[in-house]
Amino acid sequence: MSAKIGVITFPGTLDDVDALRAVRIAGAEPVNLWHADEDLRGVDAVVVPGGFSYGDYLRTGAISALAPVMQSVIEAAGRGMPVLGICNGFQILTEARLLPGALTRNQGLHFHCVDTHLEVVNTDTAWTGTLEQGQKILVPAKHGEGRFQAEPDTIRMLEEEGRVVFRYTDNFNGSINGIAGITNETGRVVGLMPHPEHAVETLTGPSVDGLELFLSAIGTIAA
């Protein structure tokens, strides 16, 4: 049986269909999960995709973090289920306290839509096992509130414990230490602002580098 990877849809989610397609291209079974679901439908991993869930009211990701499906995701993550938060999904994971820090307005207060090179810093996670440390991958980024910030002690902890997963090579949004993605203490929960699901086909993306995250998750599930 192929791995089952769920992708959550919230009101205002934009990239759920792309994430479902990426899961399918990688060879797993995509499962659509609705924000009001309490049952994760037997999935082996979850993707929290990008968009503007609930219109970004209050704070980006703040309302979505309280949705019924996220309570189930929090419990599943506690049991070791791989979870990937992309863009707004990363914001949701920080609001749900599955990952530390916060994503704030970009430096210069501009919305950026760019293809960006990321340095792979940590390959010891559920979502980066097929990548190589130091490898550069090319994926799209599109956000207005993607500047990663945290207290100095938290930044120190992330760096010292090797929990920075991706780093911008150009740091266009002003994130502290160029941090583009991080993981939790187990390496099973990963969040990043750029969009790997938009880099899985040569016809539609700048590369196919993003496919490796989904292939890594499939390998993790099979292990």
Curated annotation (Swiss-Prot):
SMART domains: GATase_5 (SM01211)
Localization terms from the record: Cytoplasm
Pathway where it operates: Purine metabolism; IMP biosynthesis via de novo pathway; 5-amino-1-(5-phospho-D-ribosyl)imidazole from N(2)-formyl-N(1)-(5-phospho-D-ribosyl)glycinamide: step 1/2
Coiled coil ranges: none
A GO biological-process term: 'de novo' IMP biosynthetic process
Glutamine amidotransferase type-1 domain: residues covered: 4-223
The keyword Iron belongs to this UniProt entry's keyword annotation: no
Subunit field text: Part of the FGAM synthase complex composed of 1 PurL, 1 PurQ and 2 PurS subunits.
Protein name in the entry: Phosphoribosylformylglycinamidine synthase subunit PurQ
Source organism per UniProt: Corynebacterium efficiens (strain DSM 44549 / YS-314 / AJ 12310 / JCM 11189 / NBRC 100395)
Gene: purQ
